[in-house]
């Protein structure tokens, strides 16, 4: 049992203890205030000094306590935090007579200390594990989408940019032919790659500038531009456009199809609120949380629209930051990929991942569908299926799914299906002569293994706890703390906001357990025997 009346001995960033003579409220602290000081005491704050240009008036440790406390109170704006520093007795006690920092100092501190904020977050998580607040056996991962600060109509679509870049390239090739006709170039554009065309047009532009023509000559009725000046303007405009297109394509990258002009890190994606899938795409980030015993033990951020590629980065970060290794991993069907299964098993994790066909596979319609390869007889040694009519369906090709990274085989019936009495039930809307389908055999086997794990007694218990712990953290952040849109531009600053919110949720949960004297065992719902 914990003694909540015990005083907290304050210390500075170097760990030197002191007794405050300015508004010392250590004996009158609220449970969440006392818990915050307890968890923040004795951490390594040395990394904060490296990002400050001069010695700050407010100690980095005190500034971190002030910001986390403000997030716990639901105040995330730097101006609101500044007002809180002048009025809140707890923060005044933490400042110990030092003038309250202004909003610029607070904002600059959060902006420059993103990595240091992440470091103390994981220091606190390790401390929670050391005092027995975490189960340290099963980790639950889930993700959500939070809207970026970027404007809603600032979208840049990769396909549209690529299409315009192709048109611009064709125009530049025509302009090179025009330069040849004017005697400004002797290079023929036919058969040349675009890099050579681009370099030659830059030379043409320089040659026109050397002619001493009036490149800014006015245009309009009664004025005729010199053909070389007209060519110069067209070349300059298209060269600028092709540079802009190349920069946009490079910023978007290979793994996404859009970005925002005002926040290039954000990707336009469909939000969770758009259940009917008829709303507007919004610039947002994919935020991931790993939970254990109702505490958030890990956070990542990405611009992926799905959760396929977020499992491995999260587990790599947990292995790097935490002082222990989990044995079980649990997630929903959004993480159901071969790549994730193989990584988890290769690194010693037992994957409790719900298959994407978990619900539909239980229906009578699914189980009685003779056209699905899952319901056909499969010869694993010779790699072929046998349909409901006893005909052989052999493998004729293979491929890899770009989204999930799963390999699949292409199977086709060795005989024509014309005249088969089961064709209408087996092929339904297909107009092909013979049965053909793609079968993810490797993924199929992994799903069978995952289904067996999830249907075991331990799997049922883990699934029940997943719905409580993984979803509960988002309920605190998005529901109670009203985090629906980030207030900063860029992925790094958005991630700092997310970390601070996760930090605040952890402290509040620890305070509730400490106040209710529930610190003996980690949160875990045990399945009662029937």
List where the protein language model places each region.
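Anion-binding and metal-coordination hotspots
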Residues: 5-6, 10, 56, 67, ...
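Short amphipathic alpha-helical interface patches used for protein-protein assembly/oligomerization
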Residues: 91-95
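Hydrophobic alpha-helical membrane-insertion signals
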Residues: 1-30
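Basic, short loop/linker segments at the boundary and entry of helix-turn-helix/winged-helix-like folds
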Residues: 26-68
